[in-house]
């Protein structure tokens, strides 16, 4: 929070979304609000997920541009907002990306070699934006929402495209991928900077996963939400790619690569129904590669067994 408050570009609003927290977060936020009238608190009555919370924050914002920041990350410099605002205005940008460093919470050490970035500064304009996004591995840096300065009008267009049906799902993972996929597909101009403006903190397992029964159950629930969120992204990926052979083939490849080969919890009984539904959506896509089709059919047979 201090890294936001201490920015030398002061004409900002700071919107904090409380997604049904059970700790003393509200108390801390209210103390901050007493000292800084730019802070606005929005509370979800119950946990609604990160996709819903982020879109709610955007809908309640007033500025021309928006950024998101996870609760445990920070900005690396106090002139980040001023640099990004001036660049976006100068080039009339819809999206402006930048680099992020990765820091271990245990060591507090920032390794300049351990960062997420494109290696050079460049500007691209439509139609090359959507081509770039689909053709690189969409798990990588291009999908981190916190690494972009975004024109609000573009974000509102994406929210409208998603509609209440998707936004109201309790999506608690892959929300950045969903949003960046649609933002990239609808942006008219994008610039990437190689400057490191953002720090991502990595928490060791002993802080995030407890061996206690209670926390083991919570972790399993997290796994379930993660798989359900990816299924939603897979559905969106297929729905919003262009109706041509190349794009649909790429969408299918991403689905296969992520869900079958990386997702370890897709046999959970409560999401099998959704898994089968999404698999059938891909099977009914006439542009799906034969190898992908065979892999999905084989997978569905395993589920039946």
Annotate each PLM feature.
Residues 1-231, 240, 293, 304:
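Nucleotide-sugar donor-binding/catalytic module of glycosyltransferases
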Residues 233-234, 279:
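Non-transmembrane amphipathic alpha-helical segments
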Residues 90, 249-305:
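Membrane-interface aromatic/basic loop that binds lipid-linked glycans or pyrophosphate carriers
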Residues 241-246:
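Flexible helix-coil transition and linker loops at the boundaries of alpha-helical arrays
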């Amino acid at each position: 929070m201090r890294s936001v408050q201490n920015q030398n570009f002061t004409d900002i609003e700071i919107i904090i979304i409380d997604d049904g927290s059970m700790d003393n977060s509200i108390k801390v936020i209210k103390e901050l609000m007493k000292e800084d009238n730019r802070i606005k608190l929005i509370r979800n009555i119950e946990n609604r997920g990160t996709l819903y919370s982020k879109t709610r924050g955007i809908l309640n914002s007033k500025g021309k541009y928006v950024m998101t920041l996870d609760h445990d990350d920070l900005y690396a410099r106090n002139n980040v907002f001023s640099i990004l605002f001036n660049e976006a205005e100068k080039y009339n940008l819809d999206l402006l990306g930048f680099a992020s460093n990765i820091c271990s919470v245990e060591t507090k050490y920032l390794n300049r070699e351990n960062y997420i970035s494109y290696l050079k500064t460049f500007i691209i304009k439509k139609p090359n934006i959507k081509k770039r996004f689909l053709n690189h591995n969409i798990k990588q840096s291009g999908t981190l929402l916190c690494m972009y300065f975004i024109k609000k009008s573009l974000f509102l267009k994406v929210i409208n495209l998603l509609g209440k049906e998707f936004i109201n799902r309790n999506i608690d993972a892959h929300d950045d991928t969903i949003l960046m996929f649609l933002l990239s597909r609808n942006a008219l101009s994008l610039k990437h900077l190689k400057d490191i403006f953002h720090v991502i903190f990595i928490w060791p397992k002993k802080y995030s996963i407890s061996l206690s029964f209670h926390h083991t159950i919570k972790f399993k629930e997290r796994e379930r939400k993660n798989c359900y969120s990816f299924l939603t992204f897979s559905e969106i990926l297929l729905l919003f790619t262009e109706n041509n052979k190349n794009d649909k083939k790429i969408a299918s490849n991403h689905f296969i690569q992520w869900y079958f080969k990386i997702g370890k919890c897709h046999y959970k009984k409560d999401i099998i129904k959704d898994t089968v539904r999404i698999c059938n959506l891909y099977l009914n896509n006439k542009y799906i590669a034969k190898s992908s089709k065979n892999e999905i059919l084989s997978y569905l047979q395993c589920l039946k067994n």
